[in-house]
Amino acid sequence: WYFFAIFVGVIVGLMFEPLPGGAIGFIGVTLVAVLSPWVLYSPAELAKPGFKSFNAALTWALSGFSNTTVWLIFAAFMFALGYEKTGLGKRIALMLVKAMGKRTLTLGYAVAIADTVLAPFTPSNTARSAGTVYPVIRNLPGLYESKPNDPSARRIGSYIMWVAIATTCVTSSLFLTGLAPNLLAVELVAKTAKISFTWMDWFKAFAPVGILLLVLIPLVTYWLYPPEVKQGDEVPKWAAGELGKMGGFSSREILLAILVMVALALWIFGGDFINATTAAMVVIS
């Protein structure tokens, strides 16, 4: 019950964020380690000859930092942060919107492709969809006087937003590193069933269904929830203007793009000679 109380306290802290999430988690682990005789171990374990609860508690507290899954999640988040800080994620989305935004249907595919390109290196659908894709596409409905919570949303806004939401649900499952819980699930399967998955194993297993869904989402949405605006020049013009403001590719964007391609190549082709976590850490280093 003491452990449960600390666990609930950490969850509440993460919800209300009086401190950064990392600090709250660290405090929770530290409390469990310090109070281990009452929180972590049973009287029978404490009574064992030579058992030192505080040494064992320290080993428990630090065990997570030796977990390869944790480090792979960390590495993927570093890539996601790089997309945001360099502006490469925004540039990719704008380039796709500029190239495919003249027709509403192809605009839907541009949104889907943008999310798919970012997914392997963003293990959070919130960070990917809401943090990178949404800041770009939220500007598009207004170009056609399509407003949220208004009948005019049917002009184009509802279509774009629904495609974005549905797409990120698929890309989160398509790639092992597309969502942090995927990595935790692989770790759980490895421990319980003694079955290991590589990055490529996961992708090949879901690709037949995932790719089909990515192809169908913009099209089926276009049929079932048709936008009133079918085509126009406003979106490509707006995207071209935004790209003009960003200027040419910076050296940081080019470097990040190269590192991303190297990491992806190692994950796809290097499974037989290098661990996915090692590959990610090498690239980040």
Residue ranges and their predicted role:
Residues 1-72, 191-192, 201-285:
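Hydrophobic transmembrane alpha-helices of multi-pass small-molecule transporters
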